[in-house]
Design a protein with these regions (language model features):
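Claisen-condensing/thiolase-fold acyl-transfer catalytic domains that form or cleave C-C bonds
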Residues: 1-43, 47-50, 119-241
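Flexible glycine-/small-residue-enriched beta->alpha junction loops
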Residues: 42-90
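Flexible, active-site-proximal loop/turn residues at the rims of small-molecule/cofactor binding pockets
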Residues: 48, 103, 110-114, 199-202
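Short glycine-/acidic-enriched loop or helix-start segments at secondary-structure transitions
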Residues: 53-54, 111, 207-208
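Short, charged N-terminal helix-start/capping segments
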Residues: 63-77, 109-134
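Short, contiguous, pocket-lining structural segments
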Residues: 71-78, 89-92, 96, 127-132, ...
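N-terminal leader/propeptide and maturation segments of large enzyme subunits in energy/redox metabolism
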Residues: 73-113
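Short alpha-helical interface patches
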Residues: 104, 111-115, 143-149
Length: 241
């Protein structure tokens, strides 16, 4: 991280704040500093390089250290547990998963989808992410300063930050209350949504998040820049923004 800061080249030396998690969390912390009047410009950046190791296994170390992590369920297996739960409750179908995979661009047709063998039952390879190395950066500026930097700044009019527990025993795998609460606090339901960028690593998560946010499962237009096609740890969330 120090080498990254050197590469950015802040001269003269300025305040730098290092946070963990996705770059979207760094953006939220930056927004808070703007509200406090501590800064009027900021560079927010994040990057990830999962290629040297097995990311789906590394993520298992974040689970409950006593009851879950020693069993080494990888990220694919946990997503599969969630998918099986939703399928058996008949809240989603294999057709929904296939449609989402086509929308994400991991597969071209339903026939091709159903021809794939199970990868992490009941998920197929097209349901799961392909990990990629990458980075993202964006510049934030306060009102008054932003107009000096560009002719047409995009404004943050609502923002909220929430998280669900990672303990399986205290959460419902068929709901995302943190997302619903964050959407409410950010004012999502106060107006029509023209464009929605979702950071979802699996088709089952994409479907569930759309339901929680009351977004259509099959929108008229869909971006092929989907994180399932290229999931970059710590950068994919900020990239959506």
């Amino acid at each position: 991280f120090v080498m990254t800061l050197d590469a950015v080249g802040p001269v003269p030396p300025i305040s730098e704040s290092h946070v963990e998690m996705d770059g979207a969390w760094a953006l939220y912390e930056t927004w808070v500093k703007f509200q406090m009047g501590l800064i009027d410009t900021a560079l927010v950046y994040s990057y990830g390089k999962p290629s040297p190791g097995s990311l789906q296994d590394v993520l298992s170390t974040q689970l409950d250290p006593y009851y879950v992590a020693p069993l080494w369920p990888d990220a694919h297996a946990i997503a599969a547990l969630q998918a099986r739960h939703l399928l058996e409750k008949e809240e989603i179908s294999f057709e929904d998963l296939a449609d989402c995979a086509i929308r994400a661009g991991t597969i071209d047709s339903k026939e091709e989808y159903f021809d794939q063998p199970m990868f992490a039952d009941p998920l197929r390879r097209a349901d799961c992410p392909t990990y990629a190395d990458g980075g993202v950066a964006m510049i934030l500026a306060a009102e008054g300063k932003a107009e000096e930097l560009c002719d047409r700044p995009a404004w943050i009019t609502g923002i909220d930050h929430r998280i669900d527990s990672h303990h399986f025993g205290v959460r419902n795998l068929s709901a995302i209350p943190s997302a619903k609460k964050a959407a409410l606090n950010a004012g999502l339901h106060q107006t029509d949504v023209d464009l929605a960028e979702l950071h979802t690593s699996y088709t089952v998560q994409d479907i569930l998040l759309r339901k929680e946010l009351n977004l259509p499962l099959n929108p008229e237009k869909s971006s092929k820049n989907h994180p399932i096609k290229a999931e970059t740890l710590m950068a994919s969330g900020l990239l959506r923004i």
